[in-house]
Amino acid sequence: MSIVKNEPKYKNGLLQAIREQLEHRAYWLYLLCDEAGKRGLDWKEFGYPAIRRCGLEHGARHIKKGNTDSLKGLKKVLFTKPAQLVFEMDVLKSTDDELNIDFHYCPLVKAWQKAGCTDEEIATLCDIAMCGDHGIGEAYGAVLDLPKCIAKGDDICSLRYHKKK
């Protein structure tokens, strides 16, 4: 039996349509990793650097778009109201140097559940996907801590960005 609990509280049609788009992309990640694994490649070995690179590039774009490298700016350009609804987020703290957000639902995890991934595969895919968030944080001169993670059996994902001292 799976330890992963991931059911949305809000299920209106528009949210579901947006979530399905995110699920589709998460399914791509799973299929890429699955095919790579069949060829003897370790998912993490290529997934971590590729997705981190994506995060670094997106972080640089977000900084340019928001015209700031403050974590308040990151919240404004990435963790928008629509994103907050889709992932059922609670923004707990947002300052120039600290950003704390709890996610109560993850469409990526839902995609991997639908694909029949094991708990271990879901956790690994999440670790790979989160390299993007780590890369974004790095672009902002911040570190991301993830003390709780839906993909690992927790009830929420706790994203804790803080500027490097």
Residue ranges and their predicted role:
Residues 125-137:
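A conserved amphipathic terminal alpha-helix motif
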Residues 1-127, 143-157, 162-165:
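N-terminal accessory segment detector
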